[in-house]
From Swiss-Prot:
It catalyses: tRNA(Ala) + L-alanine + ATP = L-alanyl-tRNA(Ala) + AMP + diphosphate. Its EC number is 6.1.1.7. GO terms for molecular function: alanine-tRNA ligase activity; aminoacyl-tRNA deacylase activity; ATP binding; catalytic activity, acting on a protein; transferase activity; tRNA binding; zinc ion binding. This is Alanine--tRNA ligase.
C-alpha cells in the first residue's frame, strides 16, 4: 500500500476517474445555492441532485468530485470516537444514465488494488451487499474477490423518501486483530457491531429504482436512466493509508493539534483521552470553511450551528487551560493544510479570523451571563429546600449559554447539589431528533420526468433578438409529447427563441406567439430550462399549434427592458457593496423582477444609514457616468484571467458570458443587460434587512419606480411640512428640532413636578414608621406611573434617617412593582424581595441595599405589605 499525503490521496482519486472519462466537478460552497431543502451541503451527491432527478442533463454523464460537507446531527460524538467529524470531504464518482454496476465495481477494485493507484492488499478488503442483489455479488467474484470476503447485509438498500433508490455495496478495510480485542471477527460486519477493525472506506449506490413510499420495495419501478452514486470519506481513506489509529492522527488534523499543544502547554497523547484536542481540531475546520463560504455565527439556522461549534471548541480550550480567545489563531493552519485544493481559506483568512475572534469574545461575555443564570437557579432551589437542578435548566444552560453539563455539575457540587442527568439527556435527545428529522426532509430527490429527459432536439437562445421566426420542434401536453394542441396550458420548444428562460436570478420573459398571418395563437406566461437545456415555454393556447410549423416569437420588450435595468443595477450594487463594505459582501441570492431588484449578500451586521447612502450614491454615479455595458463569450479560464467575478457555488460550462460595465464591474452572467448604464436612469434603495444569520437583503428600484419612490418620500415630507407650518420642505428639520427642544423642556418640568409630588407624598409615607425586633421599617403602597418613581422615593428616603428598611409597592397597569431598600447589613434587600415576590406571583432580586421585583397579582398587595414584619 502506497504511503500518500491527504493531498495526494485526493488528487489520485480525481486523476483515476479522469482516466475513465469523468469530468472533475469542483467542490462547491458549503452553503447551498438554490436549494432551500438543505441547511448545509451534507454529501458529495448533494450538489448533483439536479442531474440525478433529471431536472438537468449534464454535459458529461460521468462525474467525479472531492466535495467538502458538513453534518452536525451527531455533534456530541465528535471527539469521543475515532471517525466522527462535523466537516469532512466526500470523494465520489457518479454515472448519470451511463455506466452501471459492472463498471462501477470493476473500476473501484482497480483503483484500490492496482499498484499504479492506491495498491491496497486485496486480502484486507471486505465487501457487503444487499442479499437480493446477486449481480453485485457475482461481479465482485468476477473481479477477483474471495467469496468469504462478501457479506450480505439486509440494510444495504439506499432510499430517502420518493425518488431514485437502489441497493448499495460497501467496501471495508480490515485493520487486523489488534483492533479486535475480543476476537469477534467477521461477525462485526455481519451483525453491524460498532468496531475499529473493519473500517468502511467506500459506499457504491446502484440507483436503479424510483422509490414510492406507497408501495412495497418489490414493486418499485425501474428508473428510465440508471445511475451510480458513490462516496468515499477522504479522512477514513487517509487514516487507513497513513496507518493512523484514528482520523485525527493524520496530516489533515495533526498540524492543528500541534498548534493547540503550543497554545495550551499540554501534550496530545495518542493513547490517552484527547477529546478536547479532537473537538478543537474538528470544529475549527468547520468554522473556517463555513465562514469562508459566507455563513456567519448567529441564533438560528446554520448561524446557530456555527455558534454552537465555536462555543463547544472554546469550552474545550478552557479544559486545556486556554482562557482567552485562541481559535482564530488556528485558521492559518487550517488554510495551509487544505491550500492545494481549497485556497479560499487562506484567501479569506483575515475575514475568517475577525469573525471567529469576535465570536469568541462575545461568548466570553455570554458565559459570564450564564454563570449569573446558574447562580440564580441555585439560589431559588435553596429557598425551596431542593437540591437537584432540573434537566431542562441544565439543557438551557447548555443550549443558550454554551455550558457543558460538566460545568453545571461543578457549580451544583459547590452548592451541595446534583443535576438531573436523565432530564438533560432527554432534552438533548429531543433536540437531536428534531435535527435528524429536519435533515431527512431535505434529502430526497424528485422523481425523474422521462418525457422531458427524452427531448434532445436543439434549441438556441438569441440574446439580441426581441422577435424572430422559428420552427416549433416539441409540444408537451399532460406530460407527453404530442403532434398538435388547440387549447389549454401546454409547453413548447422552438429551434430558436428570443425568450429568456428564468435563470441566475432573472425572471423569465413574457410575450406572444403569432402564426404566419400575424394572428396571436398563444401567450407565453413562463419560460424554464428543460433537462437538456432547451427553453421550455409555458403558454396559454389561443388557436391550434402544430409541430414543425414556423411561428413568430415576440417578447414583451418593455417588460424585458425593465428587467434588464434591474439586472445591470444588481451588478453595480454588487460592486458597490465590495467597495464600501468589503470583499466578503458577496452575493448569496438575487431576484431581478420587473418592478424591483432584490439582492442578498453576506455581511455580519446591519448596514448603517451612512453605508447605505454611500452605496446608493456610488451606484447612481456609475449610472450617470453612462458606462458602456459589454458582453463577450469565452472559456471559463480566460474569463477568470480577465478578472471576472464567479459566484461561489454556481456551476459554469466550458463557454461563459462575461459582462463588463466600464472598468467598474466584471462578472460571469448569462442574463440580459442594458447597453449603457444611463438607460437605468435612477437607483434607490428602499429597504435593508437581515434574513438570517450573516445574510442581509437589499430591496431596490430603478428608473420610473425609483422616481416614484422619491416622489412618495417628497409627498410625505410635504405633508409633515404642512403640519408643522413650514413654508418649505427644507425647513422641516429646523421645525422638528424646535419641537424636540420644547419636548425636552416639558419633560424636564414634568420630572421636577413629579419629584416635588413624590417628596410631598413621601412626607406622609415616611412618617408611618413601624418597628419589629429592633428594626424600623416603612411598608406602604404608593400611586405612581412608572417604576422609576419608586426609585425617586427611595432616593429621598436615603437622604434622612427615616427607618432601616423601606418597602414600596405600586400597581402599574395590570402589573405589580415592588421596591425594597435597606440601610443596614443585617437586612439584605435582595434576599427580602425574593421572599416577598411570590406573594404577588412574581420574581425579583438585587443588591443588599436595593432590590426590585415584578408580579401580576394585584389583590395580594396588602398581603405582601403585611408579610414584611414576619420577615424581620
Amino acid at each position: 500500500m502506497k504511503q500518500l499525503s491527504s493531498a495526494q490521496v485526493r488528487q489520485m482519486w480525481l486523476d483515476f476517474w479522469a482516466t475513465k472519462g469523468h469530468s472533475v466537478e469542483p467542490s462547491v460552497s458549503l452553503v447551498p445555492v438554490n436549494d432551500p431543502t438543505l441547511l448545509w451541503i451534507n454529501s458529495g451527491v448533494a450538489t448533483l441532485k439536479k442531474y440525478f432527478d433529471g431536472t438537468i442533463i449534464p454535459e458529461n454523464p460521468r462525474i467525479t468530485n472531492a466535495q467538502k460537507a458538513i453534518r452536525t446531527n451527531d455533534i456530541e460524538n465528535v471527539g469521543k470516537t475515532a471517525r466522527h467529524h462535523t466537516m469532512f470531504e466526500m470523494l465520489g464518482n457518479f454515472s448519470i444514465g451511463d455506466y452501471f454496476r459492472d463498471e462501477a465495481i470493476t473500476w473501484a477494485y482497480e483503483l484500490l488494488t492496482s499498484p499504479e493507484w492506491f495498491d491496497f492488499p486485496a486480502e484486507k478488503l471486505y465487501m457487503t451487499y444487499y442479499p437480493d442483489d446477486k449481480d453485485s455479488y457475482n461481479r465482485w467474484i468476477e473481479v477477483g474477490v474471495d467469496p468469504s470476503h462478501l457479506i450480505p447485509i439486509e440494510d444495504n438498500f439506499w432510499e430517502i423518501g420518493a425518488g431514485p433508490s437502489g441497493p448499495d455495496t460497501e467496501i471495508f478495510f480490515d485493520r487486523g486483530e489488534a483492533f479486535d480485542p475480543e476476537n469477534i471477527g467477521l461477525r462485526l460486519l455481519a451483525e453491524d457491531i460498532e468496531n475499529d477493525r473493519y473500517i468502511e472506506i467506500w459506499n457504491i449506490v446502484l440507483s436503479q429504482f424510483n422509490a414510492d413510499p406507497a408501495v412495497p420495495r418489490s414493486e418499485y419501478k425501474e428508473l428510465p436512466h440508471k445511475n451510480i452514486d458513490t462516496g468515499a470519506g477522504l479522512e477514513r481513506l487517509v487514516a487507513v493509508i497513513q496507518g493512523a489509529k484514528t482520523n485525527f492522527e493524520t496530516d489533515l488534523f495533526m498540524p492543528i493539534i500541534r498548534e493547540v499543544e503550543k497554545l495550551s502547554g499540554k501534550v496530545y497523547d495518542q493513547d490517552g483521552d484527547n477529546m478536547s484536542f479532537k473537538v478543537i481540531a474538528d470544529h475549527i475546520r468547520s468554522l473556517s470553511f463555513a465562514i469562508g463560504d459566507g455563513a456567519l455565527p448567529g441564533n438560528e439556522g446554520r448561524g446557530y450551528v456555527l455558534r454552537r461549534l465555536l462555543r463547544r471548541a472554546s469550552m474545550h480550550g478552557q479544559k486545556l487551560g486556554i482562557n482567552e480567545p485562541f481559535l482564530y489563531k488556528l485558521v492559518p493552519t487550517v488554510g495551509k493544510i487544505m491550500e492545494s485544493y481549497y485556497p479560499e481559506v487562506l484567501e479569506k483568512r483575515d475575514f475568517i479570523e475577525k469573525i471567529v475572534k469576535s465570536e469568541e469574545e462575545s461568548f466570553a461575555r455570554t458565559l459570564h451571563s450564564g454563570q449569573h443564570f446558574a447562580q440564580g437557579i441555585v439560589a431559588d432551589l435553596k429557598e425551596k429546600g431542593q437540591s437537584v437542578i432540573a434537566g431542562q435548566d441544565v439543557f438551557k444552560l447548555y443550549d443558550t449559554y454554551g455550558f457543558p453539563v460538566e460545568l453545571t455539575e461543578e457549580i451544583a457540587e459547590e452548592a451541595g447539589m446534583t443535576v438531573d442527568r436523565e432530564g438533560f439527556e432527554a432534552a438533548m435527545k429531543e433536540q437531536q431528533e428534531r435535527a435528524r428529522a429536519s435533515a431527512v426532509k431535505g434529502g430526497s430527490m424528485g422523481m425523474q420526468n422521462e418525457t422531458l429527459q427524452n427531448i434532445t432536439v436543439e434549441s438556441v437562445f438569441n440574446h439580441n433578438a426581441s422577435q424572430l421566426s422559428s420552427k416549433l420542434v416539441a409540444i408537451v401536453a399532460d406530460n407527453a409529447e404530442v403532434e398538435a394542441v388547440s387549447e389549454g396550458t401546454t409547453s413548447l420548444i422552438f429551434a430558436e427563441t428570443p425568450f429568456y428562460a428564468e435563470m441566475g436570478g432573472q425572471v423569465a420573459d413574457h410575450g406572444q406567439i403569432l402564426d404566419e398571418s400575424g394572428k396571436v395563437v398563444a401567450t407565453v406566461t413562463n419560460v424554464q430550462k428543460a433537462p437538456n437545456g432547451q427553453a421550455l415555454h409555458t403558454v396559454e393556447v389561443l388557436a391550434p399549434l402544430a409541430l414543425n410549423q414556423e411561428y413568430t416569437l415576440a417578447i414583451d420588450s418593455n417588460r424585458r427592458h425593465r428587467v434588464m435595468k434591474n439586472h445591470t443595477a444588481t451588478h453595480l450594487l454588487h460592486a458597490a457593496l465590495h467597495n464600501i463594505l468589503g470583499n466578503h459582501a458577496t452575493q448569496a441570492g438575487s431576484l431581478n423582477e420587473v418592478e424591483f431588484l432584490r439582492f442578498d449578500f453576506t455581511h455580519f451586521q446591519a448596514v448603517t444609514a451612512e453605508e447605505l447612502r454611500a452605496i446608493e450614491q456610488q451606484v447612481n454615479e456609475k449610472i450617470w457616468e453612462a458606462l458602456e455595458v459589454k458582453t463577450v463569450e469565452t472559456d471559463i479560464d480566460t474569463a477568470k484571467e480577465m478578472g471576472a467575478m464567479a459566484l461561489f457555488g454556481e456551476k459554469y460550462g466550458k463557454e461563459v458570458r462575461v459582462v463588463t460595465i466600464g472598468d467598474y464591474s466584471i462578472e460571469l452572467c448569462g442574463g440580459t443587460h442594458v447597453g449603457n448604464t444611463s438607460e437605468i436612469g435612477l437607483f434607490k434603495i428602499v429597504k435593508e434587512e437581515g434574513i438570517g444569520s450573516g445574510t442581509r437583503r437589499i430591496l431596490a428600484v430603478t428608473g420610473k419606480e425609483a422616481f416614484e419612490a422619491y416622489r412618495e418620500q417628497e409627498d410625505a415630507l410635504k405633508a409633515v411640512a404642512a403640519t408643522l407650518k413650514a413654508p418649505q420642505v427644507k425647513e422641516v428639520p429646523h421645525k422638528v428640532e424646535g419641537l424636540q427642544e420644547q419636548l425636552r423642556q416639558l419633560q424636564k418640568e414634568n420630572a421636577e413636578l413629579k419629584e416635588k409630588a413624590a417628596a410631598a407624598a413621601a412626607g406622609d409615607i415616611f412618617k408611618d414608621v413601624k418597628e419589629v425586633n429592633g428594626h424600623r421599617y416603612i411598608a406602604s403602597q404608593v400611586s405612581v406611573s412608572d417604576a422609576g418613581a419608586l426609585r425617586t422615593f427611595a432616593d429621598n428616603w436615603k437622604q434622612k434617617d427615616y427607618s432601616d428598611l423601606l418597602v414600596l409597592v405600586a400597581a402599574i397597569g395590570d402589573k405589580v412593582n415592588v421596591l425594597v431598600a435597606s440601610k443596614t447589613k443585617d437586612l439584605h434587600a435582595g434576599n427580602l424581595v425574593k421572599e416577598l415576590a411570590p406573594i404577588i406571583d412574581g420574581r425579583g432580586g438585587g443588591k443588599p441595599d436595593m432590590a426590585m421585583a415584578g408580579g401580576s397579582n394585584q389583590p395580594k398587595i396588602q398581603e405582601l405589605l403585611d408579610a414584611v414584619a414576619g420577615k424581620l
